[in-house]
Amino acid sequence: MSSAEFSMDDFEDTFDSNATISTKDLFEGSDRLPLNQSINTTIQNLYLPNGGFAIGDQSQQQYYQAMPPLNQSDQFNLGRSNNLTPRTNQLQQLQQQQQQQQQPQQQQQQQTYGTQSPIHMSQTPSSPLSSPLPSPTPFSRQQSYNNNNSNNTSSSQNYNNNNININNNNNNNNTNNNNNNNNGNNSNGNNGNNNNNNNNNNNNNTNNNNNNNQQQQQQQQQQQQQQQQQQQQQQQGNPNLSSPQPILDTIYKLLSEQEQTLVQMIHEQSLLLNRLPPTLDENSLAPLKSLSQKQITLSGQMNTEMSALDATKKGMILEPTDLAKLFALKQDLQIQFKQLSLLHNEIQSILNPQHSAPKPNVALVLKSQPFPVVISKGKQLGENQLVVLVLTGARSNFHINGPVKATMICDSHPTNKNNPTTPLEMDSQPIYPATLTAHFPLKFLAGTRKCSVNLKFGVNIRDLDNVTTTVESDASNPFVVITNECQWEGSAGVLLKKDAFDGQLEITWAQFINTLQRHFLIATKQDPVRPKRPLSSYDLKYIQTHFFGNRSIIHQQDFDKFWVWFGKSMQTLRYQRHISTLWQEGIIYGYMGRQEVNDALQNQDPGTFIIRFSERNPGQFGIAYIGVEMPARIKHYLVQPNDTAAAKKTFPDFLSEHSQFVNLLQWTKDTNGAPRFLKLHKDTALGSFAPKRTAPVPVGGYEPLNS
């Protein structure tokens, strides 16, 4: 059976359409104006030419104009200086602004957990890029300024210490002089000398005290000015503190420049390597050393960008579109880092041949992947969902033997080691010479028993000495293959927990929610870039209040208790017929407490109802409605499994059949994004879910009944 014959109702039906969306499409799609405004304001902030982008809004321009201009010497082309770019400096400033914004949250955490906080996110390393490059020393202008301030502070401290020593010496002199006077040195000459010495010492003390007072006053004035500046920034409501757009757009611009820089590096490095003389000397190695230093500097810039992306994910709750942008940037950045590492390894094999590995300078990277996701046994990926890219250095002194092979691994071991059943089909694919890519429309033939697994890809490379070496890729994102839909809840929980915590015992609330939102959109089969109804800020507040005690730090044990309830609601949203669509249309209000329901139904007509998830019965719906009895009161009905147990009876059918339910309070949102109710008759709200019946064809002269 071909892939086209499968109904991709698990995740492929929605996810495949977005699998080939590039980072450029995400940032510069059909609607270019909003992006151009954002990029333009970022460029203005960095005082670089905008290249014809649209003008940003007035409030952002005013903020950027208030910033001090950069020195002309700080601006240069990537790969042609030992300093970081002004945009990287600005990236560090944006990170510092985010940290300042998160300080009140950290203070609240200290009040909650005490000084012995169970987690210190500032010490958590960012996602590592397996790079052989040494850690570069940052050369940002801002850090140099901070270093100068540190030196000035040290000098001030030394100066104060000197003053203290001088005062002590003078006091000792005064004491000695007084002792001399008491010991009977009564000659007029001696007395005059002593008096003069005392006067001089007193004058010195006065001068020193005046200097100390002036320094203290200057320090106090500087502190007051800094406090006033911070208060002004808080009053102005700087948009950079609450929006990820400046960081995301800046990194996107950097990625575009880095792509051009890498192409130039490959060309330059190829020329240098091809022109090397047989006997190497200092003059022939100097250009390679210079290029190697540029690569180290560029790797430092990439590390800064990766740290900024990780900090954004951990410190700020992102909208779905921004989440998609962040992961696309991270994917492209990892590929660029791998390419840079290959170029650097190639130079190091000449500069330091004794320390270089004798393997081909080739790498396999995942250009696109649909994971993390739960996949049903027998499903097949789309043609462009899983693509492997071959990267090389500046010289292609090797031959590729055979196709690229995919292997499923669990805990770093192949899953089919002791299993005779082959878990994958279409697991061997050729490399397209024009693009150096291999496309894997994998078909999954066996379940993974609720265990998360990964994919690795390998290819045989033969060098010029006819030595064959296997080159392997890094592991893919995790996924789980299930054999029955009843396994989905447990498998999705395993996958979400692994993806969110990544081996850590505790994570920030923002990091947890960003991961949950991503998995929720996949589970409800929504467009991950522009979903119709993701989890709103009010849904997230409900979750944080009811399951995590409004804490800003989430522990794995907290997650286990949360998933017992939330996982069942996700299972219902995913597999029960029409439920995902009912959620997206707002017919199911979703996550709402009983008291909130009672407040919403106050003063409503009899028959008005709201649909929500039951708080005490996970995965089931509760319907709150106004009864027809007098006096009217709010009733609550728990939808039973047998209410929709018939083969063709759906939840909309159940609502249509019961006269107690007349007018639906449908979830919608106002212009500010706040939820509100829209009152509709149930026939209007559920009309699209009614079964389509065709009129019978008249037979033998009989006429059909008219309704």
Curated annotation (Swiss-Prot):
Transmembrane segments: none annotated. Residues 583-686 form the SH2 domain. It holds the Pfam family STATa_Ig. Changing N484A: Loss of DNA binding. Residues 70-89, 112-121 have a biased composition (Polar residues). Disulfide bonds: none annotated. Residues 90-111, 142-238 have a biased composition (Low complexity). The keyword Repressor applies. The record marks Q380, R577 as: Interaction with DNA. Monomer, in the absence of tyrosine phosphorylation. Homodimer, or heterodimer with another family member, when tyrosine phosphorylated. Belongs to the transcription factor STAT family. This is Signal transducer and activator of transcription A. It comes from Dictyostelium discoideum (Social amoeba). The gene is dstA.
